[in-house]
Regions:
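Conserved glycine-rich Rossmann-like NAD(P)H-binding loop of the short-chain dehydrogenase/reductase
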Residues: 26-43
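Substrate-binding pocket helix/loop in short-chain dehydrogenase/reductase
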Residues: 93-94, 98-106, 188, 199
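Alpha-helical segment proximal to the catalytic Tyr-Lys
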Residues: 122, 166-170, 227
Length: 243
């Protein structure tokens, strides 16, 4: 992936930050997105040693996507590797869930992936090379009470990934999905110790995953030698869920 122009959405912290850093260390020219200027500056600080940078992008804004991709093409070149990581949650039980809760999660977690992948696919087809990795969730396969919107969006990514793999495979483009299990991030660190212990007891590996666990799985799928892997969902969950 050396010198491949790479776009990682949601690169400020956690899984996204780990992916951006790991790919940059591998030689990719990484641009990571954030939702604020402060976040973009944080991404730039992390990626500058590797020649990367951060940018502000609202992934639900179609015009902003177009403008950002034009900026990247002018400065780094056409995107060859796309990591669709940006995501939000609006957790609540179905009877309490508002339309806005549903729409916000769908727009960020699913529709943005459609828009971004559509936008980068043409230059990828022209180059006859591309890597698209969507970041899903074990919840997209298992479901989870209180996360109907999130689970539906992540399950939708599985179908999107398979369909795009079929459409784009003849052009040297692979499309895959990495589905993390329970990862040690800000969210899980905020859980009470008893709840964290209960969570870990469900995992045969006996621990929470780390952002680096996900990042290295993504790195494999981005490699030139992974060109025969496409349309797959790679579960990285310590044995919590088996396909």
């Amino acid at each position: 992936m050396k010198d491949r122009v790479t776009l990682v959405t949601g690169a400020t912290r956690g899984i996204g930050a780990a992916i951006a850093k790991t790919l940059a260390e591998g030689g990719a020219k990484v641009v990571g997105t954030a939702t604020s200027q402060a976040g973009a500056e944080k991404v730039t600080e992390a990626l500058t040693p590797f020649g990367g940078r951060g940018v502000v992008l609202n992934v639900t804004d179609a015009a902003a996507i177009d403008a950002t991709l034009k900026d990247i093409e002018a400065k780094e070149g056409a995107v060859a590797i796309l990591i669709n990581n940006a995501g939000i949650t609006r957790d609540t039980l179905l009877m309490r869930m508002k339309d806005d809760d549903w729409d916000a999660v769908m727009d960020t977690n699913l529709k943005s992936v459609f828009r971004l992948t559509r936008a980068v696919s043409r230059p990828m087809m022209k180059a006859r090379f591309g890597r698209v990795v969507n970041i899903g969730s074990v919840v997209g396969s298992m479901g989870n009470a209180g996360q109907v919107n999130y689970a539906a969006a992540k399950a939708g990514l599985i179908g999107l990934t398979k369909s795009l793999a079929s459409e784009l495979g003849s052009r040297g483009i692979t499309v895959n999905l990495v589905a993390p299990g329970f990862i040690d991030t800000d969210m899980t660190q905020a859980l009470p110790e008893a709840q964290r212990t209960k969570l870990i007891d469900l995992i045969p590996a006996g621990r929470l995953g780390t952002p680096d666990d996900i990042a290295h799985a993504v790195k494999f799928l981005c490699d030139e030698h992974a060109g025969y892997v496409t349309g797959t969902t790679l579960h990285v969950n310590g044995g919590l869920y088996f396909t």
